[in-house]
Amino acid sequence: MYENFLLYNLKNLNELPSQAYWEYEKGKSIKTNDVLKAIEIRNKYMDKIQNLFKHYDFLALPSAQLFPFEKNLNNPEFINNNKIDTYHRYMEVYTLSSLLGLPTISIPVGFNNKGLPMGMQIIANVKEDNKVINFAKSYEEIFNFSKFKPELME
């Protein structure tokens, strides 16, 4: 983190964007035992996921917990009227595949009644990158959502 801090060319931590400062503050309190416990939890989740992949070729999840939000907003404060405690919450659906190192691809699945896009992430088992890419290619050839362009909003 220190080397990255130098790249910002900042005089003090308070000049960091709020999200980066939050990351720094949380990260500096992590101890070795915390990392070991996290690895143990990750391994348990990996076992559960491997069990799922015995029965399913892919897992499908939304690409986000909410539709795109106002461009001048750093992050939403609420999801479904529930106040969120960190900006990570609106991206939380990616946690599973990211932490477990699973090949994942997002594909467009349409728009809401305001014309805002939504996607679906397709997750494959470890080392099945080609399988998930081929699935996404076939899906796009059938549904071709990427050809639909909503009108730009002000």
Protein language model annotation of sequence segments:
Residues 57:
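Conserved acidic residues
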Residues 1-50, 66-67, 103-109, 113-116:
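Short helix-loop capping/hinge segments that flank enzyme active sites or metal/cofactor-binding pockets
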Residues 37, 69-90:
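Short, surface-exposed loop/helix-turn segments at secondary-structure junctions
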Residues 35-36, 98-154:
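Structural helix-boundary/capping segments
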Residues 63:
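Substrate-recognition/cap regions that form aromatic- and gly/pro-loop-enriched pockets
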Residues 50-51, 84-107:
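Small-aliphatic-rich amphipathic alpha-helix that forms the alpha element of a beta-alpha
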